[in-house]
Swiss-Prot record:
Subcellular location(s) per record: Nucleus
Keyword tRNA-binding: no
Expression sites (tissue/organ): Expressed in the most dorsoanterior endomesoderm of the blastula and gastrula embryo, and later is restricted to the forming liver diverticulum.
Lineage: superkingdom: Eukaryota
Protein role: Recognizes the DNA sequence 5'-ATTAA-3'. Transcriptional repressor. Regulates the differentiation of both endothelial and blood cells. Probably plays a role in the proliferation of vascular endothelial cells during blood vessel development. Establishes anterior identity at two levels; acts early to enhance canonical wnt-signaling by repressing expression of tle4, and acts later to inhibit nodal-signaling by directly targeting nodal/nr1 and nodal2/nr2. May play a role in liver development. Induces heart development.
Name of protein: Hematopoietically-expressed homeobox protein hhex
One Pfam family from the record: Homeodomain
Gene Ontology biological process terms in this record: anterior/posterior pattern specification; embryonic hemopoiesis; heart development; liver development; negative regulation of DNA-templated transcription; negative regulation of transcription by RNA polymerase II; positive regulation of Wnt signaling pathway; vasculogenesis
Molecular function, one GO term: sequence-specific DNA binding
Biased composition (Polar residues): 237-248
Annotated keywords: Developmental protein, DNA-binding, Homeobox, Nucleus, Repressor, Transcription, Transcription regulation, Wnt signaling pathway
Source species of the chain: Xenopus tropicalis (Western clawed frog)
Matches recorded under InterPro entries: HD (IPR001356), HD_metazoa (IPR020479), Homeobox_CS (IPR017970), Homeobox_DNA-bind_prot (IPR051000), Homeodomain-like_sf (IPR009057)
Region of interest (Disordered), ranges: 197-274
Amino acid sequence: MQYQHPSSSALGLSVPLYAPTPLQPVHPTPFYIDDILGRSSASNGTPALPTPTLPSPNSSFTSLVATYRTPIYEPTPIHPAFTHPGAALAASYGASTYANPLYPFSRPVSEYTHALIRHDTLGKPLLWSPFIQRPLHKRKGGQVRFSNDQTIELEKKFETQKYLSPPERKRLAKMLQLSERQVKTWFQNRRAKWRRLKQENPQGNKKDETESLENICEESQERCLSAEQKSRESSLDEPTSSPTSQETLDSEVSDDSDQEVDIEGDKGFYNCAH
Protein backbone atom coordinates (compact mmCIF):
# COMPACT_ATOMS: atom_id res chain seq x y z
CA MET A 1 0.00 0.00 0.00
CA GLN A 2 1.35 3.41 -0.96
CA TYR A 3 0.01 6.52 0.68
CA GLN A 4 0.76 10.11 -0.32
CA HIS A 5 -0.17 12.99 1.90
CA PRO A 6 -1.92 15.91 0.17
CA SER A 7 0.56 18.34 1.57
CA SER A 8 3.40 16.49 -0.16
CA SER A 9 1.92 17.21 -3.61
CA ALA A 10 1.77 20.88 -2.74
CA LEU A 11 5.37 20.73 -1.63
CA GLY A 12 6.45 18.75 -4.67
CA LEU A 13 7.65 15.78 -2.56
CA SER A 14 7.04 12.13 -3.21
CA VAL A 15 8.43 9.79 -0.56
CA PRO A 16 7.80 6.04 -0.63
CA LEU A 17 6.27 4.80 2.58
CA TYR A 18 7.14 1.11 2.29
CA ALA A 19 8.44 -0.10 5.65
CA PRO A 20 9.59 -3.73 5.49
CA THR A 21 10.67 -3.62 9.12
CA PRO A 22 8.62 -0.99 10.91
CA LEU A 23 10.00 0.29 14.15
CA GLN A 24 7.98 -0.19 17.26
CA PRO A 25 9.06 2.33 19.89
CA VAL A 26 8.83 1.47 23.52
CA HIS A 27 6.39 4.30 24.16
CA PRO A 28 3.74 4.77 21.45
CA THR A 29 3.82 8.18 19.88
CA PRO A 30 1.39 9.90 17.49
CA PHE A 31 4.19 11.23 15.29
CA TYR A 32 4.37 8.22 12.97
CA ILE A 33 2.18 7.96 9.88
CA ASP A 34 1.48 4.33 10.60
CA ASP A 35 0.01 5.19 13.98
CA ILE A 36 -2.07 7.96 12.48
CA LEU A 37 -3.33 5.74 9.64
CA GLY A 38 -3.97 2.83 11.97
CA ARG A 39 -6.05 4.86 14.32
CA SER A 40 -8.03 6.56 11.55
CA SER A 41 -8.67 3.28 9.66
CA ALA A 42 -9.70 1.50 12.84
CA SER A 43 -12.25 4.15 13.69
CA ASN A 44 -13.73 4.87 10.22
CA GLY A 45 -12.61 1.94 8.09
CA THR A 46 -11.24 4.30 5.44
CA PRO A 47 -8.13 6.46 5.57
CA ALA A 48 -9.12 9.84 6.94
CA LEU A 49 -7.44 12.95 5.76
CA PRO A 50 -6.53 15.58 8.34
CA THR A 51 -8.44 18.81 8.07
CA PRO A 52 -6.34 21.79 7.00
CA THR A 53 -5.84 23.87 10.12
CA LEU A 54 -3.21 26.31 11.23
CA PRO A 55 -0.40 24.20 12.69
CA SER A 56 0.97 24.97 16.09
CA PRO A 57 4.65 24.56 17.00
CA ASN A 58 3.88 21.32 18.91
CA SER A 59 1.27 19.91 16.52
CA SER A 60 1.56 16.60 14.67
CA PHE A 61 1.57 18.40 11.29
CA THR A 62 5.01 19.91 11.89
CA SER A 63 6.25 16.49 12.89
CA LEU A 64 4.73 15.06 9.71
CA VAL A 65 6.66 17.58 7.63
CA ALA A 66 9.79 16.50 9.43
CA THR A 67 9.11 12.86 8.53
CA TYR A 68 8.98 13.78 4.84
CA ARG A 69 12.44 15.20 5.15
CA THR A 70 13.86 11.94 6.56
CA PRO A 71 13.00 8.31 5.70
CA ILE A 72 10.65 6.59 8.11
CA TYR A 73 12.25 3.16 7.86
CA GLU A 74 15.65 2.19 9.13
CA PRO A 75 17.58 -1.05 8.55
CA THR A 76 18.58 -1.22 12.21
CA PRO A 77 16.66 -0.16 15.31
CA ILE A 78 17.57 3.12 16.99
CA HIS A 79 17.20 4.39 20.50
CA PRO A 80 13.64 5.35 21.43
CA ALA A 81 14.76 8.75 22.67
CA PHE A 82 15.70 9.70 19.09
CA THR A 83 12.53 8.51 17.38
CA HIS A 84 11.34 12.12 17.31
CA PRO A 85 13.37 14.14 14.78
CA GLY A 86 13.73 17.07 17.17
CA ALA A 87 15.02 14.94 20.04
CA ALA A 88 18.61 15.06 18.81
CA LEU A 89 18.47 18.82 18.53
CA ALA A 90 16.87 19.08 21.94
CA ALA A 91 19.58 16.87 23.41
CA SER A 92 22.36 18.89 21.84
CA TYR A 93 20.96 22.40 22.30
CA GLY A 94 18.86 21.83 25.39
CA ALA A 95 15.21 22.49 26.06
CA SER A 96 13.73 25.69 24.73
CA THR A 97 10.46 27.31 23.85
CA TYR A 98 10.77 26.14 20.20
CA ALA A 99 10.85 22.36 20.50
CA ASN A 100 10.62 21.95 16.76
CA PRO A 101 13.10 20.83 14.08
CA LEU A 102 12.05 23.79 11.93
CA TYR A 103 13.89 26.06 14.39
CA PRO A 104 17.49 24.81 14.53
CA PHE A 105 18.53 27.64 16.87
CA SER A 106 16.60 26.38 19.82
CA ARG A 107 18.15 28.75 22.34
CA PRO A 108 16.86 32.30 22.69
CA VAL A 109 18.68 34.98 20.77
CA SER A 110 19.55 36.79 23.99
CA GLU A 111 21.78 33.89 25.06
CA TYR A 112 23.84 34.12 21.87
CA THR A 113 24.14 37.90 22.10
CA HIS A 114 25.11 37.62 25.77
CA ALA A 115 27.97 35.35 24.77
CA LEU A 116 29.31 38.09 22.50
CA ILE A 117 29.25 40.71 25.23
CA ARG A 118 31.93 40.81 27.90
CA HIS A 119 32.07 43.06 30.94
CA ASP A 120 35.40 44.60 31.81
CA THR A 121 36.73 45.32 35.29
CA LEU A 122 34.99 48.70 35.45
CA GLY A 123 31.60 47.16 34.64
CA LYS A 124 31.30 48.65 31.16
CA PRO A 125 30.08 46.17 28.49
CA LEU A 126 32.40 45.65 25.58
CA LEU A 127 31.46 43.97 22.33
CA TRP A 128 33.76 41.01 21.93
CA SER A 129 35.92 41.05 18.85
CA PRO A 130 39.39 39.65 18.15
CA PHE A 131 40.48 43.11 17.02
CA ILE A 132 38.95 44.98 19.95
CA GLN A 133 40.31 42.57 22.54
CA ARG A 134 43.90 42.88 21.36
CA PRO A 135 46.16 44.22 24.13
CA LEU A 136 46.86 47.91 23.81
CA HIS A 137 50.49 48.90 23.47
CA LYS A 138 51.83 51.10 26.21
CA ARG A 139 53.32 54.46 25.48
CA LYS A 140 57.06 54.28 24.94
CA GLY A 141 57.93 57.06 27.33
CA GLY A 142 55.44 56.10 30.00
CA GLN A 143 54.56 58.13 33.06
CA VAL A 144 57.68 58.85 35.09
CA ARG A 145 57.30 59.11 38.84
CA PHE A 146 59.92 61.42 40.31
CA SER A 147 61.15 60.92 43.83
CA ASN A 148 60.75 63.57 46.52
CA ASP A 149 64.39 64.63 46.31
CA GLN A 150 64.22 64.96 42.54
CA THR A 151 61.01 66.99 42.73
CA ILE A 152 62.48 69.33 45.34
CA GLU A 153 65.60 69.96 43.27
CA LEU A 154 63.55 70.55 40.13
CA GLU A 155 61.26 72.98 41.96
CA LYS A 156 64.25 74.90 43.31
CA LYS A 157 65.70 75.16 39.85
CA PHE A 158 62.36 76.25 38.40
CA GLU A 159 61.97 79.04 40.97
CA THR A 160 65.22 80.62 39.86
CA GLN A 161 65.09 79.70 36.19
CA LYS A 162 62.03 78.93 34.10
CA TYR A 163 63.96 77.88 31.00
CA LEU A 164 67.05 75.71 30.79
CA SER A 165 69.74 75.77 28.17
CA PRO A 166 70.92 72.41 26.78
CA PRO A 167 74.12 72.36 28.89
CA GLU A 168 72.18 73.23 32.05
CA ARG A 169 69.58 70.61 31.27
CA LYS A 170 72.27 68.01 30.72
CA ARG A 171 74.01 68.95 33.97
CA LEU A 172 70.77 68.84 35.96
CA ALA A 173 69.74 65.50 34.46
CA LYS A 174 73.12 64.01 35.31
CA MET A 175 72.91 65.32 38.87
CA LEU A 176 69.39 63.93 39.43
CA GLN A 177 70.07 60.69 37.50
CA LEU A 178 67.39 61.45 34.93
CA SER A 179 67.34 61.69 31.18
CA GLU A 180 67.38 65.04 29.40
CA ARG A 181 64.00 64.27 27.90
CA GLN A 182 62.48 63.72 31.34
CA VAL A 183 63.87 67.02 32.62
CA LYS A 184 62.64 68.84 29.52
CA THR A 185 59.17 67.33 29.84
CA TRP A 186 58.99 68.19 33.53
CA PHE A 187 59.88 71.82 32.86
CA GLN A 188 57.33 72.04 30.06
CA ASN A 189 54.57 70.71 32.31
CA ARG A 190 55.68 72.94 35.16
CA ARG A 191 55.62 76.04 32.94
CA ALA A 192 52.12 75.17 31.75
CA LYS A 193 50.98 74.80 35.35
CA TRP A 194 52.69 78.06 36.28
CA ARG A 195 50.92 79.94 33.48
CA ARG A 196 47.57 78.47 34.46
CA LEU A 197 48.03 79.51 38.08
CA LYS A 198 49.18 82.91 36.94
CA GLN A 199 45.97 83.43 35.00
CA GLU A 200 43.79 82.22 37.86
CA ASN A 201 45.51 84.21 40.64
CA PRO A 202 47.57 87.12 39.30
CA GLN A 203 48.16 88.74 42.73
CA GLY A 204 49.63 85.63 44.24
CA ASN A 205 51.88 85.23 41.25
CA LYS A 206 53.15 88.79 41.68
CA LYS A 207 54.15 87.97 45.24
CA ASP A 208 55.90 84.85 44.06
CA GLU A 209 57.71 86.82 41.39
CA THR A 210 58.88 89.45 43.88
CA GLU A 211 60.06 86.77 46.26
CA SER A 212 61.91 85.00 43.49
CA LEU A 213 63.50 88.29 42.39
CA GLU A 214 64.57 89.02 45.96
CA ASN A 215 66.09 85.58 46.20
CA ILE A 216 67.93 86.14 42.93
CA CYS A 217 69.23 89.51 44.15
CA GLU A 218 70.37 88.02 47.43
CA GLU A 219 72.17 85.25 45.63
CA SER A 220 73.82 87.73 43.26
CA GLN A 221 74.89 89.93 46.20
CA GLU A 222 76.38 86.95 47.96
CA ARG A 223 78.27 86.08 44.82
CA CYS A 224 79.55 89.64 44.45
CA LEU A 225 80.65 89.76 48.10
CA SER A 226 82.42 86.45 47.80
CA ALA A 227 84.19 87.67 44.65
CA GLU A 228 85.32 90.89 46.40
CA GLN A 229 86.54 88.96 49.40
CA LYS A 230 88.55 86.65 47.18
CA SER A 231 90.11 89.59 45.37
CA ARG A 232 91.09 91.21 48.70
CA GLU A 233 92.67 88.05 49.97
CA SER A 234 94.65 87.69 46.78
CA SER A 235 95.86 91.32 47.03
CA LEU A 236 97.00 90.83 50.64
CA ASP A 237 99.01 87.80 49.72
CA GLU A 238 101.03 89.72 47.08
CA PRO A 239 104.14 91.82 48.30
CA THR A 240 103.80 95.62 48.37
CA SER A 241 107.01 96.35 46.42
CA SER A 242 109.52 94.24 44.58
CA PRO A 243 113.26 94.23 45.61
CA THR A 244 114.40 95.50 42.21
CA SER A 245 112.24 98.59 42.50
CA GLN A 246 113.57 99.22 46.04
CA GLU A 247 117.21 99.05 44.86
CA THR A 248 116.61 101.50 42.05
CA LEU A 249 115.01 103.94 44.47
CA ASP A 250 117.97 103.68 46.91
CA SER A 251 120.49 104.20 44.14
CA GLU A 252 118.67 107.26 42.92
CA VAL A 253 118.59 108.74 46.42
CA SER A 254 122.29 108.04 47.01
CA ASP A 255 123.27 109.58 43.71
CA ASP A 256 121.32 112.71 44.45
CA SER A 257 122.90 113.13 47.89
CA ASP A 258 126.55 112.35 47.00
CA GLN A 259 127.02 114.32 43.78
CA GLU A 260 127.45 118.07 43.75
CA VAL A 261 125.86 120.01 40.98
CA ASP A 262 127.52 123.26 39.74
CA ILE A 263 124.99 125.97 39.07
CA GLU A 264 125.93 128.60 36.45
CA GLY A 265 126.23 132.18 37.73
CA ASP A 266 126.80 131.23 41.33
CA LYS A 267 130.38 132.62 41.40
CA GLY A 268 129.46 135.91 39.80
CA PHE A 269 126.57 136.30 42.20
CA TYR A 270 128.81 135.79 45.14
CA ASN A 271 131.51 138.17 43.78
CA CYS A 272 128.95 140.89 43.32
CA ALA A 273 127.69 140.43 46.79
CA HIS A 274 131.09 140.68 48.30
